[in-house]
Regions:
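Non-catalytic, surface beta->alpha helical segment in thiol-disulfide oxidoreductase systems
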Residues: 161, 167-197
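Short pre-active-site segment immediately N-terminal to redox-active cysteine/selenocysteine motifs
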Residues: 107, 114-118, 161
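Typically the conserved alpha-helix immediately C-terminal to a functionally engaged Cys/Sec
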Residues: 121-136
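Short, intrinsically disordered low-complexity segments enriched in Ser/Thr with adjacent Pro
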Residues: 4, 26-28, 34-38
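A short beta-strand-turn-helix
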Residues: 92-109
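Cys/His-rich microdomains that often coordinate metals
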Residues: 66, 86, 126
C-alpha cells in the first residue's frame, strides 16, 4: 500500500506523534527486547518476511529494508541497523547498485531527479529539489541519480534530456517531467503526481 501525500494517509504520515515506545523517552525509536505492541517498534526485514501493517522504507545510509508503522513516519524514525534517520530532509544519492533497492522495495513513493554535474539547469534546480525534499518527506522519498555514472539505469528509463524527474510508486513509474522547475512548481507537480496514482 503506497503512502499518498494528498490523501487520507497524508495526515497519518505527516503528523508528529508525541509519545514514544515504552522505556525510550524522547530518544530515537529502537526495537525492544520484549514483545512489542503493534505499531511501536521498527524492524529490519529480509527477503520474504512479512511487513504486516508497516511501510517498507529503504535506509538511505545502509540500504537496509526497514518496516515503519504508517502513523510513525512523521516521528523521525531511525534505522535499527545503522541508527541514522530514515528521513533527513536531503535527497538520497542513488547509483546503479542501489537504485532498484530504493525504488522497487519502498512502499513510500520515490521521486528521482535524473541529472548530470555538467548540466546547468540540473545545478540550478538542485536547491529547489532539496527544499521540496525537506518539506515533503516522509510523504515521499527524494533521490538523485547521476546519469553520467549510472548510464544503464538512465537508458532503462529512456532518459533523453536532463533534468528529468520520475515519480515511482510500488516500483513502477507513475509520472515523468523533463526540465527544471522552481520549488513551488516542483512541489505542485509532485503533490499532483502522488494524488493521481
Amino acid at each position: 500500500m503506497a503512502l499518498l501525500y494528498a490523501g487520507t494517509m497524508a495526515a497519518d504520515a505527516l503528523k508528529v506523534v508525541a509519545d514514544r515506545p515504552e522505556g525510550k523517552g524522547s530518544g530515537p525509536l529502537q526495537p525492544r527486547a520484549s514483545a512489542p505492541k503493534s505499531g511501536t517498534t521498527l524492524d529490519t526485514f529480509g527477503a520474504g518476511e512479512p511487513m504486516n501493517d508497516k511501510q517498507r522504507i529503504v535506509c538511505q545510509h545502509c540500504d537496509g529494508l526497514v518496516g515503519v508503522p504508517a502513523e510513525r513516519l512523521g516521528d523521525g524514525p531511525r534505522c535499527p541497523k545503522c541508527h541514522t534517520p530514515l528521513f533527513d530532509g536531503h535527497p538520497v544519492e542513488l547509483n546503479s547498485s542501489n537504485f532498484d533497492q530504493h525504488v522497487a522495495r519502498s512502499d513510500v513513493p520515490v521521486v528521482v531527479d535524473f541529472w548530470a554535474p555538467w548540466c546547468a539547469p540540473c545545478r540550478m534546480m538542485a536547491p529547489a529539489f532539496a527544499e521540496v525534499a525537506s518539506r515533503m518527506e516522509p510523504a515521499a522519498r527524494f533521490a538523485k541519480l547521476n546519469t553520467d555514472e549510472s548510464q544503464q539505469v538512465a537508458a532503462r528509463y529512456g532518459i533523453r534530456s536532463i533534468p528529468t524527474l520520475i515519480v515511482f510508486k510500488g516500483g513502477r513509474e507513475v509520472a515523468r517531467q523533463p526540465g527544471a522547475m522552481a520549488s513551488a512548481q516542483l512541489m505542485r507537480w509532485v503533490s499532483d503526481a502522488l494524488s493521481r496514482s
